């Protein structure tokens, strides 16, 4: 299979794809990576499936999110792309944006219904990913949007635990504050 060949086209049977279609799909994935919102809009209006996936299960939203292109993400979501589709590794677009530190992308995803608590199969959330890489602004923003600082992954670790394990003292401290504030009775 060629790099970025579409492994799956939603709603269609798995038929062999022509080399021409594979080359076209590869170009489309590059358009998402580059964040060319106008070209994506044109292609979507012409019938491009908004949830097109490559051979790794990455959607156009995932690729645009991971590369920090909020306008491209917005266009895809306005064409009914699913903001929570995971790739073959179980990663969500919001987790990819949190890893890279792209707050405008996360804002766009959340404004279009992405699950702030959407977890990968190992239970890791976007908050945990941001915490691991000491992205304080991301951690604060995700908490302000409802991310649970006390959520645990499949191994029983919280975002604070992940931050401490990765040597991310700033986010570990911020998460400790958030956890304490959450456990305090209202008005105290």
PLM regions: where:
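Conserved ankyrin/ankyrin-like repeat signature
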Residues: 39, 71-72, 104-105, 137-138, ...
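Ankyrin-repeat-protein effector appendages
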Residues: 1-28, 144-145, 154-157, 161-188
């Amino acid at each position: 299979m060629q790099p970025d060949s579409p492994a799956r086209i939603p709603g269609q049977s798995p038929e062999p794809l022509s080399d021409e279609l594979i080359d076209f799909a590869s170009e489309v994935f590059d358009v998402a990576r580059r964040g060319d919102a106008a070209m994506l809009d044109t292609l979507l209006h012409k019938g491009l499936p908004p949830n097109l996936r490559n051979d790794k299960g990455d959607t156009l939203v995932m690729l645009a999110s991971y590369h920090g292109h909020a306008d491209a993400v917005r266009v895809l979501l306005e064409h009914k792309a699913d903001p929570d589709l995971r790739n073959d590794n179980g990663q969500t677009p919001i987790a990819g944006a949190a890893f890279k530190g792209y707050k405008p992308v996360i804002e766009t995803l959340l404004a279009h219904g992405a699950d702030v608590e959407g977890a990968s199969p190992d239970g890791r959330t976007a908050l945990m990913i941001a915490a691991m890489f000491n992205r304080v602004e991301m951690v604060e923003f995700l908490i302000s949007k409802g991310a649970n600082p006390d959520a645990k992954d499949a191994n029983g670790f919280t975002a604070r635990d992940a931050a401490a394990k990765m040597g991310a003292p700033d986010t570990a401290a911020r998460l400790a504050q958030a956890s304490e504030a959450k456990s305090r009775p209202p008005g105290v």
